[in-house]
């Protein structure tokens, strides 16, 4: 049996998502979308709702853009490793809906973080000009990547297969999935609180996607549901 054909037949959504994300990445490179202030990012990355660059469709389009090859590679690797199995269990339609809900939840969480930072600037210790300057900086921030949706998949995997042993580099011994996922989420929470946007990682988007993924599978299991619809 042809291996590539087997993958397409068993995980069509995962396969197509990887293809689409890869094609979008090549399009980004071709049209200058790797630059933070590029027109491509203005149009399709997720901006704060008060930004002049914000468009509602960015809640979806940002999920298909990436900031570099390594960013794309890690997200697609996680999608392939964990998403393929979840798609086989749930079926393509259910998996696709799950994926987009987690991605949208990640966008909402990141938007909430932007809003908190925007309104949290202390006007009592800054001049009006300085406060306006820092608020303008926040309005220029933009989020891209499928990481929030991938974190939702990881959370679902950790809930569904909590005792599966995972090898995570550079840790030299296996870790149960439930502890690995909890550890990753905890690092994102800490990273978001400690660093805000200074490391260019949308930590709260990751957390939002993970929480959405966990709540969805928790609801399914409690209600013994087989569909969203």
Q: Which residues fall in each region the model found?
A:
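A detector for small-residue-rich transmembrane helices and their helix-helix packing motifs
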Residues: 1-229
């Amino acid at each position: 049996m042809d291996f590539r054909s087997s993958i397409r037949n068993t995980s069509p959504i995962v396969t197509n998502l990887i293809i689409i994300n890869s094609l979008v990445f090549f399009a980004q490179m071709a049209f200058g979308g790797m630059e933070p202030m590029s027109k491509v990012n203005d149009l399709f990355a997720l901006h704060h709702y008060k930004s002049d660059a914000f468009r509602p469709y960015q809640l979806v389009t940002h999920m298909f853009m990436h900031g570099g090859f390594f960013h794309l590679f890690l997200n697609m690797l996680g999608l392939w490793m964990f998403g393929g199995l979840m798609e086989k269990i749930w079926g393509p339609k259910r998996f696709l809906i799950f994926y987009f809900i987690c991605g949208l939840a990640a966008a909402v969480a990141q938007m909430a973080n932007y809003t908190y930072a925007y309104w949290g600037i202390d006007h009592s210790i800054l001049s009006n000009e300085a406060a306006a300057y820092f608020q303008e900086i926040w309005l220029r921030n933009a989020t891209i990547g499928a990481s929030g949706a991938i974190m939702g998949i990881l959370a679902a995997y950790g809930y569904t297969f909590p005792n599966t042993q995972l090898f995570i580099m550079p840790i030299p011994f296996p870790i149960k999935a439930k502890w690995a996922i909890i550890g990753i989420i905890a690092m994102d929470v800490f990273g978001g609180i400690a660093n805000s946007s200074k490391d260019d990682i949308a930590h709260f988007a990751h957390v939002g996607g993970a929480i959405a993924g966990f709540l969805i599978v928790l609801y399914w299991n409690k209600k013994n549901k087989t569909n969203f619809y």
